[in-house]
């Protein structure tokens, strides 16, 4: 017999199993995590690729979760392959379509013709499917991975505490600033290559901490947030520092609603692979299977 009083929702963070799902996501992010070396020869093109993904996602009305997943797949695939200029856009678009097939309704999955203005017109649907398959095989078909956006949605429900609303007339103003600031920091985290090496849950928790600190809420890290995220304030200091630095650069050089920040191609992640495997080369006419990098 159905329980009519139970709330029906597609949002996992609003269900009675949210704590269990969150625990699984934190386990999965560690189990899946690949080492990021910031060693792609095309890393200087990343800001353009991220902006393109976000632009297509906006046109197709995709979620922020889908965008974060697409960029995650693109980052780790690029880090292990040499890509020709006319191929790299195709790869980024394939990452977006794979992310959409996981996170979105089938009607929102973009079609190849939406990219015809930035990729070769000779690319066929058959060839595009081969590129998708190459990406899937590289990740061993494990592409449903947690991202910063997944964790943010859960942590947002625990953002405020009772002491934040001692002036009720400011509650709506505070919540509006909170929503806009969270989106701004999420965009900043998406554009920074320096945050890729951190677990998504840590980046998400750092966004919450940074937002509360920026809004002047005391304490900036509550016992409830510590319990929910599993992180102490001291665990997030370095990540918050990188996030804040990236936001300041973002505001200085790029309008906040525009898109992306060009990160330095010379940056080396604090977690570097002990031995770098030879990257395989992917070309438009020929697709060569690559081995997954050992880590």
Residue ranges and their predicted role:
Residues 1-295:
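Acidic, serine/threonine-rich low-complexity regulatory regions at protein termini
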